Amino acid sequence: MLSTLATIAHAQGGPPFRTDDPDTPGNKHWEINFGWIGDRNPQRGAYQVPDFDFNYGLGDRIQLKYEIPIAIEETRAQPATPTQPAIPGQVIGGLGESLLGIKWRFYEHHPNTSWLKNDFGTGLLALFGHHAPPEPSDPEDLAASASEPATNFSISTYPQLYLDNPTRSVPRGVVAPGPNFFLPIEVNARIGPIRLDGEVGYNFGNHALPQSWGRGLLVGHEFTDRTEAYLELYDEQDANTLPAGQGIGQFATGGPKQRETTLGLGGRQTLNHSKTLNLLLMAGRSFQTITNTNSQPSWIAYVGVQVLLGPAEPVTPQVEQKLPNEGKR
């Protein structure tokens, strides 16, 4: 039996990682992530407790996203220095910003096929029950590809818009002033048993939020269809500076460019027989020197649960392939 791509594709980027990937939930499928997230350095910490992340598959290649956290910002007490007064510690919390996104996997390559044939598309025909048919092949090719993944290379784009909610989270310094637009490109590939995923994106910022680059790389392996682990390198760097007088708390402008570079280890573990409930774990820290004057984190972490919902996937019977001389005696 041949199932659709959505049932074969496995998670890679996305929660619990910062780097995303081209995979989508599948037509009319939900991927819902509940995560407890932390990022702490010697001066401050940022936490989402929890983060609610809702994703819906529109066709085989498009994903709609809405995300909103309960955010907590911690300022750690700092002693006075010859140039700076003492800073009292405080913890504030509130509703975080809303994140709206749409991911489009516009290119995917299947093993044993041309790199240009039938690889571009939207996948929206799946909404009407029309999935891309399997490529015709001879028996030897079918046998060789039986253990191959559905795709071995894909590319997507994932525009995302951050919006402030009608609360006092911005004036209290819980979240950065919005709106902010993030435009990334994601690429993933399989090389033997290794999975690779890369993402590069640009935050366009606003009058109170610097523009910045986000770059991520994931390298890992799927040990079984229930267990996968990855090593992640992620770098976020301001592209400009802003004059003082905008923002509140740690989002106040006027300082030097900031950069955060982290190395993390994480993965996913299926918790039930039907593979609809997954445990998400990731932990890491900066691999650069951590001081009181830079934003390099002493630790980052993600602990969460992923719920997968959706209709049963349609299947099509595999056409029996006869050998050239079969039936001749």
For each feature predicted by the language model, list its residue ranges.
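Sec/Tat signal peptide C-region and signal peptidase I cleavage site
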Residues: L5-A11
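Transmembrane beta-barrel domains of Gram-negative outer membranes and organellar outer membranes
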Residues: A11-N206, S212-G214, L218-R329
